[in-house]
Curated annotation (Swiss-Prot):
One GO molecular-function entry: ecdysis-triggering hormone activity
Family from the record: Belongs to the insect eclosion hormone family.
InterPro entries: Eclosion (IPR006825)
Its job: Neuropeptide that triggers the performance of ecdysis behaviors at the end of a molt. It triggers adult behavior patterns: larval, pupal and adult ecdysis, and plasticization during the molt.
GO cellular component, one term: extracellular region
Protein's name according to its UniProt entry: Eclosion hormone
Record's subcellular location: Secreted
Keyword hit for DNA repair: no
Gene Ontology process terms (BP): ecdysis, chitin-based cuticle; neuropeptide signaling pathway
UniProt keyword annotations, A-Z: Hormone, Neuropeptide, Secreted
Pfam families: Eclosion
C-alpha cells in the first residue's frame, strides 16, 4: 500500500494513515499533523484507495 500511494500522494500522508489504521480511517483536517496542509480533496483521494489498504 505505501509503495503504491507514496509516489502519488504528496508527503505520503495517505500511505502512512492507510498502514496505521489498516484502511479503516481517512486522514482529515482533524487527524492530519498541523505542519502539513490538509484539504477535503486530499481526504477524498485517500478514501478512494481505502479498499487497497485492507489487504
Amino acid at each position: 500500500c505505501k509503495k503504491m500511494v507514496g509516489a502519488y500522494f504528496e508527503g505520503e500522508l495517505c500511505a502512512d494513515a492507510c498502514l496505521k489504521f489498516k484502511g479503516k480511517m481517512c486522514p482529515t483536517a482533524r487527524t492530519s499533523p498541523p505542519s502539513r496542509p490538509s484539504s477535503t480533496s486530499l481526504s477524498s483521494r485517500c478514501c478512494s484507495i481505502k479498499s487497497l489498504c485492507k489487504a
